């Protein structure tokens, strides 16, 4: 859904913070889309007495940003203030909600905010038909609660490996397809009624009006899946991202890339920016948002890794200069030509999971310095063929 620009918008929104024994950074980019429909939440210290809890989420809007933006501001409140979430507090003896009350309260919060937004005039009268996925993690001192509604995704890296990931809610999944068909719908070209690419979402009220069916039995359900994981010393980091990231990187590729970048920089905004840029250069045509939450055992900056990365940058700079000097007699080559030549070479120590796309910013900088009057497109469309093997 959504139209494309002639040239991607590569300006980024960034934020970072720390507390409760963790650090976070985030980055979002509009990219090739005509509108920016992503949103996010990052809260260290949850209100109403949960100061040692944190909450992070990414929302991937479609058909507009109304639902995504509202959820980014109000979903946490709907979760933490409903009676199910606070069930353990009724006796007054429990300082924190139980695991089961948290899971139930998260589900209730999603259903309540979805019901609440339905009454907004622009959503009720059909002037706004937007919807949004939501993927998040609520971190308590003892547990992580992973939350997913739609096809954004969260992954946990522990002991250097992906040890958990949420499951995308796609219409072709058997459980999702059965619900859609029971509600009188169909799955065509892997979409709900041939149109919507996700089977669970907030908003999307055009798909939630089947008489005699409850809110979780509609063509599109607002019910999240909630997973609890006991925290461990080996936990390194959590990545939350929209499908603009996952469309071009697997769980393992993204975690390998993040690990390698954490070894050369402790600036989490920079690491997230590298993720977004790399995905753009790998061919992503969607809005892109990523939130990185690092625990105390996350990879640390390594002198050896920094040296290796610096040597790689110098090698790439030298090769770009050589390619452009050699081609100069026939006219200055465009950036895509330079990238195609480099992609055919066996270049050691490229960022794992990112490949040459993970170093395009270095190549672009040299190219622009040597050819300042050439307009770099900053995009990925001209590189998809040359980078397909990376």
From Swiss-Prot:
Q: Give residues with lipid attachment (N-myristoyl glycine).
A: 2
Q: Can you tell me which residues bind Mn(2+) 2? A: 60, 243, 286
Q: Using the UniProt annotation, give all residue ranges assigned to the region (Disordered).
A: 1-20, 371-390
Q: Which SUPFAM superfamilies match?
A: PP2C-like (SSF81606), Protein serine/threonine phosphatase 2C, C-terminal domain (SSF81601)
Instruction: Please classify the protein's predominant subcellular localization into one broad category.
Output: cytoplasm
UniProt modified residues of type Phosphoserine: 386
Keyword list (alphabetical) reads: Cytoplasm, Hydrolase, Isopeptide bond, Lipoprotein, Magnesium, Manganese, Membrane, Metal-binding, Myristate, Phosphoprotein, Protein phosphatase, Ubl conjugation
Question: What molecular functions are annotated in GO for this chain?
Answer: magnesium ion binding; manganese ion binding; protein serine/threonine phosphatase activity
Position of the Glycyl lysine isopeptide (Lys-Gly) (interchain with G-Cter in ISG15) cross-link: 12
Q: How is the cofactor bound?
A: Binds 2 magnesium or manganese ions per subunit.
Query: What catalytic activity does the UniProt entry give for this protein?
Result: O-phospho-L-seryl-[protein] + H2O = L-seryl-[protein] + phosphate; O-phospho-L-threonyl-[protein] + H2O = L-threonyl-[protein] + phosphate
Binding annotation for Mn(2+) 1: 60-61
Q: Which CDD domains match?
A: PP2Cc
Q: Which GO terms describe its biological process?
A: N-terminal protein myristoylation; negative regulation of canonical NF-kappaB signal transduction; negative regulation of defense response to virus; negative regulation of interferon-beta production; negative regulation of non-canonical NF-kappaB signal transduction; protein dephosphorylation
Compartment annotation: Cytoplasm, Cytosol; Membrane
Q: What does the UniProt record tell us about how this protein is modified after translation?
A: Isgylation negatively regulates its activity.
Annotated signal sequence is none
Q: What class of enzyme is it?
A: hydrolase
Report, as the record phrases it, the tissue specificity of this protein: Isoform 1: Expressed ubiquitously. Isoform 2: Expressed exclusively in testis and intestine. Isoform 3: Expressed exclusively in brain and intestine. Isoform 4: Expressed exclusively in testis and intestine.
Q: How does it sit in the membrane?
A: Lipid-anchor
Q: How does it assemble?
A: Monomer. Interacts with PAK6. Interacts with the phosphorylated form of IKBKB/IKKB.
Give the UniProt family note. Answer: Belongs to the PP2C family.
Its function, per the record, reads: Enzyme with a broad specificity. Dephosphorylates PRKAA1 and PRKAA2. Inhibits TBK1-mediated antiviral signaling by dephosphorylating it at 'Ser-172'. Plays an important role in the termination of TNF-alpha-mediated NF-kappa-B activation through dephosphorylating and inactivating IKBKB/IKKB.
Know the name of this protein? Protein phosphatase 1B
Task: Name the source organism.
Answer: Mus musculus (Mouse)
